[in-house]
Amino acid sequence: MNVLLADVTSVGWIAAGAVAAVLAGHWQVLAVAAGLAAAVWIYDFAAKSTPAGPLVMGGCRGLNWLLGMTAAGGPQAAEWLLPAGMGIYVAGVTFYARQEAGRSRRLPLGLATAVMAAGLAVGGWFVVLLAADGGSDWLSRAGLDNWLLLWAVLASSVLFRCIMGIATPESGNVQRAVGNAIMSIITLDAVLVLSACGERWAIAVLLLLVPFVLSRRLASPT
C-alpha cells in the first residue's frame, strides 16, 4: 500500500507539472512527463524484479533530467550527455543494489560498478565539451581543472565504496555502498548544475539533501 501511495503521489506531481506545461504551451514537456510517468509505473509493476529493471530505473532518472531540461528550453547538442550519463549511473546503482541481500557475487558487483563509472564519465564529458565551447560564467571563473577535480573526488568516493563491496561482498558492505551511491545522486546532480548554471542553482539542488536525510529516518534508501 505504501508503494502504491508513493507511485500515485509521484505520478500525480508529474501530471500536475505536465498540465501546467501544457497551459504554458510547452507540449514537449508533456511528452517527456508522460514518458516519465509510464516508466515509473512500468518499473514498479512490471520490470522491478526482471533483468530489465536496472535499465528502466536508469530510464526514469534520465527522463527526470530531461523533463527539467525540456522545461528550460533544452536539451541542445552536448546537453544530452547529462540525462544519458545520470541514467547510466542509476542503472548501475540499481544493478548493484540487486546484490545486497545475503552474500553477493563479485562479478555482478564489478559489472555494476563499471556501469556506474561509465555513467559518471559520460556526465563529466559534458562539462569538458561545455568548456571547449566557451564554457559558462562559473567555468570561466573557476576553471575546468577545478571542476574536474571536484567531480573526480565525488566519483572516487562512490566507486571506492563499491569496490569495498566487491572486495568483501557481504550484505552490510554492499548496502553501505548502495546507500552512499543513492545519496550521492543529489550531490552529483548539484555539481553538474554548478558547471552550467553556477552556485545559486547548485545550492538549490543540494537543499534536496534535507528531505532525503529526513526520509532515511523513516525508511532505508535501499
Label each residue range with its predicted role:
Residues N2-E100:
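Intramembrane alpha-helical segments
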